[in-house]
Design a protein with these regions (language model features):
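Short, structured active-site-proximal loop/turn typified by the sulfatase FGly-forming signature C/S-X-P-X-R
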Residues: 28-77
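Short, solvent-exposed turn/loop segments enriched in Gly/Ser/Thr/Pro and often Arg
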Residues: 51-69, 128-134, 393-401
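His/Asp/Glu-rich, glycine-adjacent segments
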Residues: 67-188
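Cleavable N-terminal signal peptides of Sec/SRP-targeted secreted and luminal proteins
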Residues: 1-15, 427-438
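Acidic/histidine-rich catalytic neighborhood
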Residues: 227-264
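C-terminal GPI-anchoring signal of eukaryotic secretory precursors
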Residues: 408-429
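Active-site neighborhoods of enzymes that stabilize oxyanions during catalysis
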Residues: 253-380, 388
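Metal-dependent active-site segment of extracytoplasmic phospho-/sulfohydrolases and closely related
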Residues: 20, 39, 201-240, 381
Length: 439
């Protein structure tokens, strides 16, 4: 390839824009029931699609959304759940319902892609993210929180506003939780073209975006559903109070697939022994999280920290665990209701896998991608937008560059080659400089 051709390819990649839509609730296992809809079919015929997106543990919406947007695991970005308790300070995080949840210095310590892009002088627009209330510095150029009137991206007039934003912004992000909210009520097993009305509305709005992508040479669309959902029959809900003396428990945090336990001082091993050996909860297992002692699977990356106590209960898919005693749960005033379908389980469980869809000039045409991870999607966005300063991610571009068109892939690899040369030269210069200084 000539230098002129390479420069041209790099300029083409440099000029690209991205719309990233996070549409929670589309399960990879059940996506085939919906793939025939026009708004989805375009990705199979003209773009890239995968039904094997591996989420991170716990497979809950907020930790996975933040991993997708930061490119790092929850243990690094700190959002370990939707309900969190700093057992050292007593500070609570209540799933973006309390003002204190939005304090950047307390909870939001790793920059997501929209802040990194803003720092890199890219123009960023965000729609319907609760995170718009965080006091980011610098703040995105446009950040619209969830609307009070209930309008979402699935409403045509709102979708048209998003389309217009793609003409003036380099990165447009849309958060759409409505599909998940509906599937949580009806369950994924019952979701089909008749019952999943939110899916129908969403894919119709999506057609407006794909039409815009088709008409332009600079716009690309990525749709991600980070994880799936699992039906939980009412008879599969376990109550912690029935299996351990609650006077041994200081408090429990969260409910459903994962519940943290903070024992009374000096009672941690007794609680563990009760729940592991004497009166184990059927289909729910207790684990230590302490390093070297912890017995959770390594791929969970779930270790003791200021928001992860010594003990955690993990339910098998299709089961859930709650606490009856409101004085022994965090937050105390909230009822621990388990919906028809929930998430949070083993991130390797097939029904937890999510969906990835991509369409635009930088992507291949009609390509069925195999497995990929949320961090990989972060890396793809960084490379397409050519943003410097992205987080040192758990994603790998070489794991996913097969989804790119041949020209884009060549430009990406050329950039990687230049970066590797720069790093090699820098590593050689450091000892030389030290020798000069010492001499």
């Amino acid at each position: 390839m000539s230098i002129a051709a390479l420069v041209f390819l790099l300029q083409v990649v440099d000029a690209q824009k991205i719309v990233l839509v996070i549409a929670e609730g589309l399960s990879g296992v059940h996506f085939h029931r919906l793939a025939s809809l026009p708004g989805f079919r375009v990705f199979e015929e003209e773009g890239v699609w995968s039904t094997r997106v591996f989420p991170v543990f716990p497979t809950l919406p907020l930790p996975n959304r933040h991993t997708l947007l930061t490119g790092v695991l929850p243990r690094r970005h700190g959002i370990m759940g939707e309900i969190m308790l700093n057992w050292r300070t007593g500070q609570e995080f209540l799933n973006l319902t309390a003002d204190s949840d939005f304090l950047q210095s307390d909870w939001w310590t790793v920059d997501p892609i929209y802040i990194t892009a803003t720092k890199a002088k890219a123009s960023v627009a965000m729609f319907f993210f609760p995170e718009c209330r965080v006091n980011w510095s610098p703040s995105p150029h446009l950040c619209v929180p969830p609307r009070n009137d209930g309008l979402t991206f699935a409403d045509e007039r709102v979708a048209k506003i998003v389309v217009e934003a793609t003409k003036t912004h380099d990165l447009v992000l849309v958060y759409h939780p409505n599909i998940r909210s509906q599937i949580e009520e009806i369950g994924p097993q019952a979701a089909n073209l008749r019952s999943a009305s939110e899916v129908i509305k969403f894919q119709q709005a999506l057609e407006l975006l794909t039409a815009q992508v088709r008409d332009r040479i600079d716009l690309n669309l990525i749709v991600v559903s980070p994880h799936g959902l699992v039906d939980v029959p009412k008879q599969n809900i376990r109550v912690l109070d029935d299996y351990v003396p609650m006077e041994l428990v200081h408090t429990s945090v969260g409910c459903g697939a994962v519940k943290q336990l903070i024992a009374m001082p000096g009672k941690t091993h007794q609680v563990y022994s009760e729940l592991r050996n004497h009166t184990p909860i059927p289909n729910v297992k207790v684990y230590y999280t302490t390093p070297k002692v912890g017995d959770l699977p390594e791929w969970y990356h779930y270790k003791k920290s200021q928001t992860v106590p010594d003990l955690v209960l993990v339910a098998q898919p299709g089961y859930a665990v709650v606490t009856r005693d409101e004085d022994k749960r965090t937050p105390k005033q909230a009822a621990e209701d388990v919906k028809t379908a929930i998430s949070g389980y083993n991130n390797h469980y097939p029904e937890m896998l999510g969906v990835f869809l991509a369409y635009g000039p930088v992507f291949r045409i009609g390509y069925h991608k195999g497995p990929l991870e949320l961090c990989d999607i972060y890396v793809i966005v960084c490379y397409i937008l050519r943003i410097d300063g992205c987080n040192d991610s758990c994603g790998r571009i070489l794991r996913v560059d097969d989804i790119l068109s041949s020209d884009t892939r060549a430009a990406v690899r050329a950039k990687m080659h230049r970066s590797n040369i720069y790093r090699s030269q820098r590593s050689l210069l450091i000892p030389i400089i030290l020798v000069v200084l010492l001499s």
